[in-house]
Amino acid sequence: MTFFLSANFFTSFFSYLRLTIKKKSKMWQKEVGILLSVTKHNDKTSIVNIFSREQGYTSFIYYLARNSKGAAKNALLQPLTRVEYESKGARQGSNIQHLSQIRNRAPFKTIPFDPVKRSIAMYLSEFLTYALKNEEMNMPLFNTIDNYTEWLDSAENYSNFHLLLMIEVGKHLGIMPDSSLYKSGYFLDMKEGEYVEREPEHTDFINQQLSYKLALLSATHLNTMQNTPLTHQERVILLRMLNNFYRIHIPLFPVLKSIDILEEIFR
């Protein structure tokens, strides 16, 4: 017995096939990102915060592996790790997606093993977790952070690195003052987010000397930032001031817990 299938059958079949593939592709998405922080949810799961190239800041639920093979996978969840992963959309009533198939797309060579670099990474992961919390897709910002973390891994002179990254993130977020408008003797008014000629009447400002150093550093890049002369004390004060600046301009930005550790390193 011979069956003849009509052209309409094939049209309907291939339409169904395309729709099925499209639905599956929506269920699981491949993406690249930078791991910011991990919070233990319970014995089986953790909440993983990633700043991704396509989605911006996203929180995922991640099921922890319990065998020896999976332990290596869990070890990927380190601050600033540049990852590639698959994710599934959030279930109804939840805004947390499911994370799967995570891998390290560019393994670090020095950051996990150098105590100073590791401390910087821990601080910056906490800083970025709060600074980027409401940030959607922002490819220029993603590329900046991605390039900066790669640079740190191979760098030898990086004492101003954490300050410069905080400045660059602020530029992308539109809150950092324009250093080209700085003039000798100006103050940085942190409330207004601009350099001003007169000392502000409130206390949220940076003095003339450090305003000059901040403007100088803001005009540099990775390969020239070490040309900005900063003493250990100035570096510590600027770190505190930049944290205060973010607390003023980013809603719910807290006093960072890891700032004390970083201060000790650069004293």
PLM features: residue spans?
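Short hydrophobic targeting helices and cationic amphipathic motifs
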Residues: 4-5, 9-10, 14-17
